[in-house]
């Protein structure tokens, strides 16, 4: 027993420096991770899992049909290039003629929730001009402008007729459409924004929609973004608070849509379990990212409407069902700019209505055949509507509006592609509805150096484990072989880290021969994230530190032997003496 203890003491006496180097490497790398030195690289590795390892969950590029068969609860209605070309009005579109029409058509088509990602926080300009014209036009002004009028009675008649000749205020019409939709059971959610102005008192306030919309009592949701340090959108806030009202939660747009769709009562309030990093909202559990009020969005795919511009003529990615605003307003009373595309498309989804051009088909059999091809029945059952019992997110994707975000799919398929801001809400909503949250070891990956996130002990253990694996390899084999084995260890760890995201730790092996293995998407809630960069850096620091130490000590040994025996022994014999003790880690010559 004593001899064993002596051997252990002797071992550590001769090898304490490599162990010390390893401990220092663990501490140093952990400190660097804590202050955020690896955050940018770690975030890029996070994105790599989405755009390369897993790919989309929905759309035609999905590796299997698990999520496609299930379908999504979110439908997009976009001001896209098609709407820009076909809508018979210039931007900004009239609130009464376009947006009110869209709301009415969607609620009639069965939409359960209508979410606007377009702000209406200032009065409609064209309606204000008409309003000002009515208010400032006097009988004297009319008499002066129309010399043929001689009688003030005629001028008064014209003055009284002006309000009937000029279109109604667009804000009034939009507010009425919101109220009408909600009366028929469709929840309308309007965006609000938390604004900070240092010169105002208090410095923070909420920019609400205009009075007419507020009078319709819509749901309101914040649209303030939460960006990572590299400007990408990966997280989504549940709520925000103002400094002077820290106990009042203002829910975000996506959470309000989730609340309306799941019928969560107004009395429910998010509560945080700091031990398990879980937000409880109603009967639902939301996995928080760190100690903050946000969660990681499990993006379902790249931008739905993006098409690769090359000779392959591939279809759009189609992550979510997407429809142009032009077709949502396209009924008999709206004429699109291009008559060839004016098919009254939306009429087929409205109860009891059949497009006029179909009714104009004289041959009964042809008319029935066309109705069957279009999915139209005599009663026009809304169960065939793509909007029935769906959350419809309305926003803009046209390039001139610059409402785009960088997401984990920014480099999908090797092509840089921005995601419309409205789709960040859609992905967040679908993540909550499916409970498809991302599990992160320790609760977070980045930004530990702030008051909200605690540095997880599990990360230190992971860094320590890989560093000591590198140490043990170096203790038993020479640096060249050790370097190869450590490289293999790093590749295995990288493959496992990526594989955990798709629920398959053998992803690394399968990726070398994808045609031989069936590719499957992870089940709901089965995506796991572990830190990749800090553990790999710790391995590199450990290896370099120990090899550098060995090199320095070897040079000192050579110098000592040369100075001591150089006059008596040949140089070749001196070099061979350095490696006499053992072939892998020589005892130091004292």
Indicate residue ranges for each PLM-predicted region.
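Juxtamembrane or sensor-core-proximal signal-transducing alpha helices
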Residues: 537-574
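Short, contiguous acidic/charged loop-to-helix segments that flank catalytic cores in large enzymes
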Residues: 413-419, 548-552, 581
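Membrane-interface segments at or immediately adjacent to transmembrane helices
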Residues: 52, 56-65, 557, 567-577
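Transmembrane alpha-helical segments that form the functional core of multipass membrane systems
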Residues: 434, 438, 444-548
């Amino acid at each position: 027993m004593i001899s064993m203890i002596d051997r252990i003491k002797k071992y550590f006496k001769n090898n304490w420096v490599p162990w010390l180097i390893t401990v220092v490497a663990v501490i140093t790398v952990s400190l660097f991770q804590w202050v955020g030195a690896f955050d940018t690289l770690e975030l890029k590795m996070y994105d790599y899992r989405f755009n390369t390892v897993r790919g989309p969950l929905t759309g035609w590029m999905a590796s299997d049909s698990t999520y496609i068969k299930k379908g999504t609860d979110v439908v997009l209605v976009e001001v896209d290039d098609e709407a820009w070309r076909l809508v018979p009005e210039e931007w900004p579109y009239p609130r009464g003629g376009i947006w009110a029409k869209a709301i009415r058509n969607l609620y009639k088509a069965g939409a359960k929730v209508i979410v606007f990602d377009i702000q209406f926080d200032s009065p409609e300009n064209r309606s204000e001009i008409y309003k000002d014209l009515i208010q400032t036009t006097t009988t004297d002004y009319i008499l002066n402008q129309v010399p043929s009028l001689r009688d003030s009675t005629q001028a008064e008649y014209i003055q009284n007729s002006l309000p009937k000749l000029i279109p109604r205020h667009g804000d009034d019409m939009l507010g009425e459409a919101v109220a009408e939709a909600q009366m028929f059971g469709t929840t309308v959610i309007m965006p609000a924004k938390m604004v900070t102005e240092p010169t105002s008192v208090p410095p923070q306030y909420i920019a609400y929609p205009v009075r007419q919309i507020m009078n319709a009592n819509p749901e309101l949701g914040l649209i303030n973004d939460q960006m990572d340090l590299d400007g990408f959108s990966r997280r989504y806030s549940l709520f925000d608070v103002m400094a002077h009202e820290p106990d009042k939660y203002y829910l975000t747009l996506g959470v309000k849509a989730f609340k309306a769709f799941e019928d969560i009562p107004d009395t429910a309030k998010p509560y945080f379990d700091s031990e398990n990093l879980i937000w409880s909202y109603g009967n639902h559990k939301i996995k928080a990212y760190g100690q903050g009020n946000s969660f990681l969005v499990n993006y379902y795919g790249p931008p739905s409407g993006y098409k690769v511009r090359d000779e392959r003529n591939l279809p759009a990615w189609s992550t979510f069902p997407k429809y142009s605003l032009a077709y949502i307003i396209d009924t008999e009373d709206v004429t699109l700019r291009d008559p060839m595309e004016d098919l009254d498309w939306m009429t087929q989804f409205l109860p009891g209505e059949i497009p006029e051009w179909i009714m104009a088909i004289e041959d009964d059999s042809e008319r029935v055949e066309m109705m069957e091809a279009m999915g139209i029945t005599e009663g026009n059952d809304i169960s065939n509507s793509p909007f029935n019992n769906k959350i419809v997110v309305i926003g803009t994707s046209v390039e001139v509006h610059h409402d785009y975000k960088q997401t984990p799919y920014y480099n999908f398929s090797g092509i840089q592609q921005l995601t419309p801001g409205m789709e960040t809400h859609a992905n967040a909503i679908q993540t909550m509805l499916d409970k498809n949250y991302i599990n992160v070891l320790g609760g977070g990956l980045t930004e530990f150096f702030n008051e909200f996130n605690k540095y997880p002990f599990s990360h230190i253990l992971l860094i320590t484990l890989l560093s000591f694996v590198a140490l043990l390899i170096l203790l038993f084999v020479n640096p060249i072989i050790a370097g190869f084995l450590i490289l293999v260890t790093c590749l295995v760890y990288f493959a496992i880290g990526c594989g955990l995201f798709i629920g398959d730790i053998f992803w690394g092996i399968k990726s070398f021969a994808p045609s031989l293995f069936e590719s499957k998407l992870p089940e709901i809630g089965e995506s796991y994230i572990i830190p990749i960069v800090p553990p790999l850096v710790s391995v590199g620091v450990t290896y370099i530190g120990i090899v550098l130490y060995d090199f320095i000590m070897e040079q000192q040994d050579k110098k000592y032997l040369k100075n001591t025996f150089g006059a008596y022994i040949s140089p070749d014999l001196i070099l061979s003496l350095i490696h006499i003790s053992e072939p892998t880690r020589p005892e130091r010559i004292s």
